[in-house]
C-alpha cells in the first residue's frame, strides 16, 4: 500500500486537519513530520470542534496509531496540555496509541523568550512569528546545542547539555538587558515534565518501516504550507522548517517509503497570517466576504487571516516543489455568494512578466497579479457530498484550477463537518 502525504500548497490553513481526519479512516497510522505547536488543525466531528496543534489528527479516530517524528519541534508542556484536553472529551492516549521520536528537539521557555526578543528587535521588519519558540528551537538543533527528548533519560548528562544551551541563550539575554536564566531553572522545567512524556518515547523510524513492510497504510501529516517552507517559501516571511512533501523522509527518519501518494491542499481562494508578500490580497468587500464566510481566524493564535483570490502561479510552484500527484480544493462554499471569481494566472513587475514566483523578496513585494475572471455560481455548495451536488459553474471553476496548476483535483471540501467532502473521481 502506498504511503499518503498531505501537505499545504499555500501559506497554511488549507484545511489539512479535516482531510487527514477523513483519510485516516482507511489508514493504520498517522505521522507528523515537521513544525511544532505553532500550527493548528481544526476538525469538526458530530458538531463538536477539536483544535489540535501538535498531535496528529488521527487521535480523534479509534484504533489509529499516532506518531510524532524527529522533524517536529516538540514543546513537552504543550503536548501534555493537549493530551489532557482530549481527556475532557473522552479521548485517552497511551503509549500504545501515541509515539514520540527519541530525537525530537524540545521547545523550552528560553526559546519562547528568544523568539519574542528577536521579533521585538526586528521592529517594523517583524516577520509575524507566533513567538512560540519554534524558530529558536530549530536554530539550536542546527547549532548542535538542542535538548532532545532522549536527553531526559539521564539527568547527569542533561545538566551538561543545559549548560551548553544557556551559554548561548544568556548571551542574547545579557545583550538585551534581560535576566539570565540559571541551569537549575531549566533542569526543573525538564525534570518536572520528563515523567509525563518519556513513556511515549519510541523508535518511530523502526515502527514506520515495520508497518510499511506489513502492507499497512501510513499517512504523513504536514503542517503550515509550501509557501512557508524555509527553502522554497516567501523568504524571510516563512516558518523555520521544510514544509514540502520531500521532508517526510528526513522528518521521520525513513528513507525507503516506497510509492508516495502526495495530496496538495489549497483553498478555493487564498489566505495568509502575518506579514509578507501576498499578490492577490483583497482588502475591500471581497476580502471581507471571504474573511466572514470562511471564519478566517487562526486556530492557535486567533490572529486574523488576510484573504485574496486564488493564485494559480504560486500554487503551481508549490505543487511542483512537493511533487503533488493530486490536489484537494477546500472551502469551496466560501465563494458561493460571489458573482465573478478571479484567478491569478501570471504576475507583472514593471516591464517584466512572470509565470513563476521569483525568489527575491524585493520583487515579490512589487508583483501585480494578472487575473482571469470566471463566473460564480450563486448557489449553496455547503455540505455537498457528490459531484452531482455541485453547480455547473463550480465544477468549471475546479476544472480551470486543475488546468492552471497542472494537477488533478481528487477531493473538494464543502463545509466544516468531516463528511462535507466531494470525491471528484469516485
Swiss-Prot record:
Self-association state and partner proteins as the record states: Homodimer.
Pfam families reported for this sequence: Adenylsucc_synt (PF00709)
Disulfide linkage: none
Binding site for IMP: 13-16, 38-41, 130, 144, 224, 239, 303
GO molecular function: adenylosuccinate synthase activity; GTP binding; magnesium ion binding
Binding site residues for Mg(2+): 13, 40
Active site: 13 (proton acceptor), 41 (proton donor)
Role noted for this protein: Plays an important role in the de novo pathway of purine nucleotide biosynthesis. Catalyzes the first committed step in the biosynthesis of AMP from IMP.
Main subcellular localisation: cytoplasm
Binding positions for substrate per the UniProt entry: 299-305
Signal peptide start and end residues: none
Family: Belongs to the adenylosuccinate synthetase family.
Full protein name: Adenylosuccinate synthetase
Binding site for GTP: 12-18, 40-42, 305, 331-333, 413-415
Cofactor: Mg(2+)
Keywords from the UniProt entry: Cytoplasm, GTP-binding, Ligase, Magnesium, Metal-binding, Nucleotide-binding, Purine biosynthesis
A GO BP entry: IMP metabolic process
Keyword S-adenosyl-L-methionine: no
InterPro entries assigned: Adenylosuccin_syn_GTP-bd, Adenylosuccin_syn_Lys_AS, Adenylosuccinate_synth_dom1, Adenylosuccinate_synth_dom2, Adenylosuccinate_synth_dom3, Adenylosuccinate_synthetase, P-loop_NTPase
Family matches, as SUPFAM superfamilies: P-loop containing nucleoside triphosphate hydrolases
Catalytic activities: IMP + L-aspartate + GTP = N(6)-(1,2-dicarboxyethyl)-AMP + GDP + phosphate + 2 H(+)
